[in-house]
Amino acid sequence: MSNQKPVLYSYWRSSCSWRVRIALALKNVDYEYKTVDLLSEEAKSKLKEINPAAKVPTFVVDGQVITESLAIIEYLEETHPDVPLLPKDPIKRAHARAISLLVASGIQPLHNLKVLQLLNKKEAGFGGQFAKQFVVEGLTALEILLKQHSGKYAVGDDVTIADLSIPPLIYSANRFNLDLSPYPTVNRINETLADIPAFIAAHPDNQPDTGLNA
């Protein structure tokens, strides 16, 4: 195995990249951060040479390229098992994955930058309206699931893969000025996670490219 640091292609405000940054921090993985300006066609064109989808996060380890945030996190789980993000109990593990997928597949893609830009081209401001509707629907479902499965954290009393998606989702909701009072369980867990050093280190405000295109 190479001694070269793995490389994370990231953007400070990318929800998907944020999830991976949290996992890397929790597992104490030393890596190189490479900024991808998502508003730059040149930057995306260069990234496409590595990742055909030209998306972040893109993770390169030992010359191998891994794409998609949850696939990267699962890889880290298998290669750095000392800080587990998947519960041992199969049912809890399934719940943790389901919550993570709800956000990563059912909520986040509907308000990502590419979608908002496309919708706003058709009608000014429509992207924001569209995003708010689906974020609210997603938060409503997430609140119910967390009431069913949470302890101190999203699934039980240990941080799991499910928790990694909560801070980015709340961050996005705040950017859309959504009322978060209907989601007390989501808020409680988000506030608890905010005190964990790994979550602080992974926050958008603490990245090398913080403020780019702000």
Curated annotation (Swiss-Prot):
Its cofactor is glutathione. It catalyses: 4-maleylacetoacetate = 4-fumarylacetoacetate. The keyword Isomerase applies. Its EC number is 5.2.1.2. The keyword Transmembrane helix does not apply. One of its GO terms (cellular component) is mitochondrion. Residues 4-84 form the GST N-terminal domain. Pfam families: GST_C_3 (PF14497), GST_N_2 (PF13409). One of its GO terms (molecular function) is maleylacetoacetate isomerase activity. It is an enzyme of class 5 (isomerase). InterPro entries: Glutathione-S-Trfase_C-like, Glutathione-S-Trfase_C_sf, Glutathione_S-Trfase, Glutathione_S-Trfase_N, GST_C, GST_Zeta, GST_Zeta_C, GST_Zeta_N. Belongs to the GST superfamily. Zeta family. This is Probable maleylacetoacetate isomerase. It comes from Caenorhabditis elegans. The lineage of its organism: Eukaryota, Metazoa, Ecdysozoa, Nematoda, Chromadorea. The gene is gst-42.
